[in-house]
A protein has these predicted regions:
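Hydrophobic, glycine-enriched assembly/anchoring segments
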Residues: 141-173
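Residue-level recognition of short loop/turn positions
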Residues: 17, 111-112, 156-157
Length: 173
């Protein structure tokens, strides 16, 4: 259901209540017949998925963007039932999925079931999708068309700052 790669280590997490969430990738957004993706939840103390708290995000509009998510490429829990993620946008995929700028940085609210585009982080390819936490901020690696490097996002304020520029693909950090 998820990606076993180090840059995607945030795809399984627990919230403050001890509930387990698992992000699902949904064919990486490459199968237009099945774009289901999102989060499945096992509440603390339970052994089964809770269908009321699990969520197929492919049906949810992204605030500030014209398309919906077709995949969760990477995710990082930032607290208060919020997740930052790179989601794959099927409509932006090209003939070459390795270089297509089809990954969008978003803020996801698991409680309200909303998704918002993070302004200031460029669209990136499916390999430059690392997200880590530094203190209370999330740091995204992005290989954009006009900007390349590491970008800090403050989930409390929504502020984005480019921390450094890189030559080439910032796939891991």
């Amino acid at each position: 259901p998820t990606r076993p790669m180090s840059q995607c280590s945030g795809m399984i997490f627990t919230n403050e209540a001890g509930d387990i969430y698992i992000a699902t990738v949904g064919y990486f957004g490459f199968n237009p017949a099945n774009k289901k993706c999102g989060f499945i939840c096992i509440p603390k103390g339970a052994t089964e998925f809770d269908t009321n708290r699990s969520w197929d995000i492919s049906t949810t509009a992204i605030e500030g963007f014209e398309y919906k998510a077709a995949s969760v490429f990477s995710a990082q829990y930032v607290g208060n039932n919020k997740v930052v993620a790179y989601v794959g946008i099927h409509e932006l995929a090209s003939q070459n999925p390795y270089t297509a700028k089809s990954a969008l940085a978003v803020l996801i609210d698991l409680h309200a079931k909303t998704i918002k585009k993070i302004e200031g982080i460029p669209l990136t390819d499916g390999h430059s999708i690392s997200i880590n936490k530094v203190g209370t901020n999330a740091v995204f690696g992005a290989f954009g068309t006009d900007k390349v490097g590491l970008f800090s996002f403050d989930p409390a304020t929504g502020a984005v700052q480019q921390l450094l520029s890189t030559q080439g693909n910032p796939a891991y950090f």
